[in-house]
Amino acid sequence: MAIKRFGFIHALVSNAGIYLVKRFTDYTRDDFRALASTNLEGFIYIAQLAVKQMQAQKSGGSIVCITAALADNPIAGSPASVAMMTKGGLNAAVKSLSSEYAKEHIRFNAVAPGVVASPLHAEVPPELLAKLTPMGSITTIEDIAGAVVYLTEAHQITGEVLHVDGGAHIGKW
């Protein structure tokens, strides 16, 4: 649709994702398939279309996917390991694909949010969420959007996973 309307594609942002909170031994085959289908396959197929269009344009472009900081730095006892495995797969894809398409100036990057002020965390008191980051503040949707825009415009950045999590990814603090 964007191609028909504008005639080209400069950037793709893949923001589809689901998150199932279950202990590892409680995930079913259907749970895994749903996670893999949405979190991995969805990105693969839309990115393939974008790459083909960018190749046809011969102008390069930027592909940014939204992953999760927990994929790299899980919270002890957090029951979302399989969901984070799929997000970690996206992080690996960004590194691999950026290498594969760098010579064509097609860049792949990811934004890995931590805890975000969103409906997903609406029932958790904000002061508790803020304690999960060294900065003592909660990531906003606007923080994520700013990181995405930055990566789409930063022509010399490829293969990066940008953590937008108030410093939580730096480890024990």
Per-range role (PLM):
Residues V64-G89, V94-K103:
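Catalytic loop of short-chain dehydrogenase/reductase
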Residues R23-F24, D31-A36, H121, L129:
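Substrate-binding pocket helix/loop in short-chain dehydrogenase/reductase
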Residues A47-Q48, K95:
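A short, exposed helix-loop element centered on a Lys and neighboring polar residues
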Residues F8-H10, M54-A69, S78, K103-I106, ...:
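Active-site loop of short-chain dehydrogenase/reductase
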Residues F8, M85, N91-V94, E100-V116, ...:
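Conserved Rossmann-fold SDR core element
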Residues I106, T140-V164, H169:
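C-terminal substrate-recognition "lid" of short-chain dehydrogenase/reductases
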Residues N15-L20, G167:
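Conserved NAD(P)H cofactor-binding loop of Rossmann-fold oxidoreductase domains
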